[in-house]
Curated annotation (Swiss-Prot):
It is found in: Cytoplasm, Cytoskeleton, Microtubule organizing center, Centrosome, Centriole. Keywords: Cytoplasm, Cytoskeleton, Repeat. GO terms for cellular component: centriole; cytoplasm. CETN2-binding regions contains a conserved Trp residue in their C-terminal ends, which seems critical for interaction with CETN2. This is Protein SFI1 homolog. It comes from Callithrix jacchus (White-tufted-ear marmoset). Its main location: cytoplasm. It comes from the Eukaryota. Interacts with CETN2 (via C-terminus). HAT repeats lie at residues 131-163, 165-194, 263-295, 327-361, 392-424, 1141-1173. Coiled coil: none annotated. The keyword Hydrolase does not apply. Transmembrane segments: none annotated. Plays a role in the dynamic structure of centrosome-associated contractile fibers via its interaction with CETN2.
Amino acid sequence: MSSRWLNFHEKMIKQRMEKKVDSRYFRDGAVKKPYSPKTLSNKKSSASLGIRRELPSTSHLVQYRGTHACTRQGRLRELHIRCVARKFLYLWIRMTFGRVFPSKARFYYEQQLLRKIFGEWKEEWWVFHHEWKLCVRADCHYRYYLYNLMFQTWKTYVHQQQEMRSKYIRAEVHDAKQKMRQAWKSWLIYVVFRRTKLQMQTMALEFRQRSILRVWWSMWRQRLGQIRVSRALHASAVKHRSLSLQLQAWSQWWEQLLYAQKEKQKVASAVKHRQHWQKRRFLKAWLAYLQIRRVKRQQNEMAERLHHVTMLQIHFCNWQQAWERRESLHAHQAQVEKLARKMALRCTFTHWKHYMLLCAEEAAQCEMAEEHHRHRRLYFCFRALKDNVAYTHLQQIRRNLAYQQRGITLLHRFWNLWWSQIEKKKEREQLPLLHAAWDHHRMALLCKCVKWWLQYTQKRRYKQLLQARADGHFQQRALPAAFHTWNRLWRSHQQENVLSARATHFHREKVEKQVFSIWWQKMVQHRENRLAERMAILHAERQLLHRSWFTWHQQAAAHHQEQEWQTVARAYHRCRRLRKAFCLWRESARGLRTERMGRVQAAEFNAAQLLRWAWSQWRECLALRGAERRKLMRAELHHQHTVLLRALQAWVTYQGRVQSILQEVAAKESQHNRQLLRGVLRRWKENTMARMNEAKKTFQASTHYRKTICSKVLVQWREIASVQIYYRQQEDHAIWEARKVLARGCLRTWFQRWRDCSRRSAQQRLQLERAAQHHHRQLLLEGLARWKTHHLGCVRKRLLHRQSTQLLAQRLSQTCFHQWRQQLAARRQEQQASVRALWFWAFSLQAKVWATWLAFVLERRRKKARMQQAFQAYQGQLLQEGAMRLLRFAAGMKASRQQLQAQQQVQAAHSLHRAVRHCATLWKQKVLGRGREPQPLAPITPSRKVTFEGTLLNRIAAGAGDATLETKRPQAPWSQGALGRLAAREPHALEFNTAHSSRKQPRRPHFLLEPAQGQRPQKLQEHGLGMAEPAGPSLTHPFLAEAPTAPVPHSPLPRALSSAPGPKQAPTASTGPELLLLPPSSFMPHGAAAPARVSAQPATPRHMPQVPPSLASVPGPHPLLPGDFSGIGAGPRLSTAGCLDLEAELEGIQQQLLHYQTTKQNLWSCQRQASSLRRWLELNREEPGPEDQEVEQQVQKELEEVELQIQQLAEELQAQRQPTGACIARIQALRQALG
């Protein structure tokens, strides 16, 4: 037995370790938010420490059952696989998870609860472990059948999960593409809008500089600003491109990592859910059985308690009645004692109250007299002496009255004491009568209680006889019938519980699936919203930087002018302040002289007042202090005399220099005052000594009188209290002896009755316990039989589940390691190729930027007439070619989408077939026991590469001409017409265009196709244009000429049909010498990269021209795609008549939009001119001159004319808004039809 038990104990420990390791492998379904590189470096150490604590140590290896590894080599191979899998799993957990998740804490809490419950269950299950081992050995042949069924169900579940996974992946890919398109469009719209704003600000700065500053200064500043802007734009373009490439690579890597994590987490969650379900089911059955046992025990205990409680209540009621009588007697005696105490206290309290009232009156009168003396003693010294004498007489009279009142109170007190003693004597005489009455009442109550108790006992005996007969009848006939009915109900209830458990389990699984799907969708949405918020924050920060730079530049110039004006004004103001200060100084010097004389006179007067005040304060201090502080008063008086003498000597010397006559008068007055004060002090000292002697004598007499009275009262009170205490003790002793005798008699009777009742109850209890034990034994036998069957089923299921989890763990570890190794090699190749591509692209970008800069410098020297001609010719050709390329691109996109969808379906079917075949081979090897090694999966070929054709020099030369205007902002409003002039009449520009068209374009890697995710759906509707315009120089934003009143549009490139994804100008066959800097999205092939081209389109112009209302009713915006304008489209061609109609309609729309934009720009220029004229008038009115009146009148007239022109232009714009809306709707309808 001991050896078998040790083997079983070791097996249980191994199974627990396997559970721990499996649960830690596949725990935690939540996905952590990705950290940035900086935060990852900081959190790596803390995350590794936390994971080391949570994960099991490497010394405790997982003990798998050796089903297929019977030999030594197989075991070594299995151990090696486990170690490698555990190593890479730990690395993956440390890289992905940085903290303890709520799911981990919840799982740990549930595990601890299960451990506690299992420990309690183990103590009761200990007895039946031997039978369980025998049953398990007998039922081993049944396991293989269950294994087969379990694997079939698991295989169907895996197929369903793979199908669901493929559907989810397709939906996520489609959603990601749509969001990437919207984010890229909104970003390009933001770039276009920002550039137009910057162009308007530069025009405003130029106008102000030309009107205020000198011409040469403005020319120099303009050149310097262009150089700085070009450098800043170049740096920002390179930086932005590198950041976008990094973000795209990171997003692709993160998607692959999330996909691998999803698969692992789903498998782990399925295993964990199955384990929890089995444990809960077993524990519910066991807890129900325990609950039934507890209920029966509680019922028996409640019956016994009721019997004891009833008996105790009967005896307690009798005892309580006797106790209440005794308490009433004690309470009556206590009330009598309280009344005596209250009488004595009341007498003393009235005496003390009268004395305190007298003291309070004396204190109040003293305070009133002192306050009166303080207020009047300065001017009425002699009257104060008379008042003091009168006050002493009045005090003597009041003391006499107090003595009389005290005698009266003492008489009252002695009268009350005498009266209370007489009352006590009367009470003592009547005490025997009271005791006789109380004894008679007590005996009568005892007789009544005895009669009632006898009647109650007779009734109780009769009831007990009836109850015994009824219990016998119940045990013979009703109890067996009730037991059979209860047994039937219990069985039916168990069946209902089983059915309800199955229903709840099915419902719980369904709800968990729904909750998991909803949670997963929310997590994906939350992640996408986070990325969108980050993109929006970056855009907002850049916009704020640009705004702050331009505002600072404007404010610096204004601040410089204001500083110059302020320096002149400050110099003039300083001179005026110096003059005013000199005048004020002269006046103040005169005033100071007069003030000094007044101060001297005021000081003399103040000294006299201070002397009087000091003498008065000294008198008050003498009056307030008593006999104990006389020495201190004399010292203070001597010190005050000395201080006053010194002050008087200083004051006399000072006044002797000024006026000698005043010194003599002051000395005589001081001597006279001293003599008067000495006489007053002598009289006051005599009076105070007499008053103090009288007060001492009166106080001694009063204290002696109080002591004698208190001693007499205490002697009388002691005598009375001792007599009362003696009487009470005698009464208490008699009552206690009587109660003692009664209690003994009651206890004897109660004990006899209790002994009889206890015998009867013990016999009944023995019978009931025997019946209950017999019934419990039968129930336990039935319950144990059912529990054994249920436990055997649970054990079989648990063993099957463990083996399935082991199979899953081995398969996942192998597949994860192979896939990780292949993905690592593919990533390294992709990184190297992307680095090379970025290097070549940077060289080509630099060359393109220099080429475009030279072209713009040449084009600035052309004239307005040639630019307009080139613009008209280019506009016609662009409209013709744009419509054809739009139609071609729509057909090509449809074909490429169908081809991509077919390829994805074929790949999904192939991967599903491979996964099913691999699972089947693994299952055969592990179930049938073959020692063959599993074949490795086919290597995953990396599908994303970056390659370039030709040598390095050819690539750099080919990339030098593709520079776009996306990374370079326009420096002046007239610089965008340069390309049109080159296209029209420059021979060297035509040669440059032919070289550009014949050059090959480099390909772009697939992982750089998708930009950062983000959503800005509402941005397209705020501008009122939907997605009607790709990025490029807008139709609605032609630029003004130098004259502000009649601007001419200089931009020859309309935006409605441009081919670049940023603000660039599309090349055509006729005007092809324009230089383009293409983005990396144009380097990809036409088949696989079509979705990325679609996502790179911007879509918000400001205004569109008028279109007929019949065409504006077609709904649904769709963006124009740039690939049709530069690539080769495959699809059907339209007829010549349809193309001509479409071109004519687009030309009309373009003309309406150009007219609307020119009127808008005229309005802006007029508003700027009006604001500058108002500013000039304000500056001129601050410092008016006689010659500036005529100029102000002329400027005022010009301002009125400009305001009239502004009103007219505003009305025209208001009238043109409806036609432009119709044009926008028409363009959207065309785009939807062609898309």
